């Protein structure tokens, strides 16, 4: 078995969620959600797992289950900003691989976490690695809530967008506006998976990077890195990961999976 390169997993966990308050502490089979996520990160082989939160109750929950936790500011606009604070505080070496494991994804595949970390380690010219999978439903291609990524020949990101990219002129133009009901074009359209591995060097510089106009227009923070000349390596997987928890309905669905006897 090939061992993955060393990496650190940081789980940003914000208590004040608009759609689902106290989400990190939601009970999943007798453990808080944030602990379930931390367990997945540990299964992925992270040499260090850190829960980063602005809420003492979240830190206490993590520590009660044996995980390291660090208090961060409450005014971070994104999880990446929270990671940047942690990277600055711990003083990790520039080439340290740090994976942002979302605190609301208790079903995330540990293999995917490990593979994204390994993908960044294998691409020294890139500051970030992430993942994507082929889209097989044209409705998803045209859904602005499904973020797409266009790649170069080395599977490095050219652009991320809520729009359908790449645009297949010959496939779509004659059939507009009924294209969302069509099969997707023969060439792959990739859906971005919101899992990131960063070099610590990039995280420390991130807060000083000005917001990009394309970032503000698309409301996609990864575009800030591209705007400022950083490279993002993209790992291609065959299928979508399990969805995260954003709503009470999502929570009920996942809680059912953690009930005794559930498969």
From Swiss-Prot:
GO terms for molecular function: 3-deoxy-manno-octulosonate cytidylyltransferase activity. Its EC number is 2.7.7.38. It catalyses: 3-deoxy-alpha-D-manno-oct-2-ulosonate + CTP = CMP-3-deoxy-beta-D-manno-octulosonate + diphosphate. GO terms for biological process: CMP-keto-3-deoxy-D-manno-octulosonic acid biosynthetic process; lipopolysaccharide biosynthetic process. Keywords: Cytoplasm, Lipopolysaccharide biosynthesis, Nucleotidyltransferase, Transferase. Pfam families: CTP_transf_3. It is found in: Cytoplasm. One of its GO terms (cellular component) is cytosol. Its main location: cytoplasm. It is an enzyme of class 2 (transferase). Pathway: Nucleotide-sugar biosynthesis; CMP-3-deoxy-D-manno-octulosonate biosynthesis; CMP-3-deoxy-D-manno-octulosonate from 3-deoxy-D-manno-octulosonate and CTP: step 1/1; Bacterial outer membrane biogenesis; lipopolysaccharide biosynthesis. Transmembrane segments: none annotated. InterPro entries: Cytidylyl_trans, KdsB, Nucleotide-diphossugar_trans. CDD domains: CMP-KDO-Synthetase (cd02517). Belongs to the KdsB family. Activates KDO (a required 8-carbon sugar) for incorporation into bacterial lipopolysaccharide in Gram-negative bacteria. This is 3-deoxy-manno-octulosonate cytidylyltransferase.
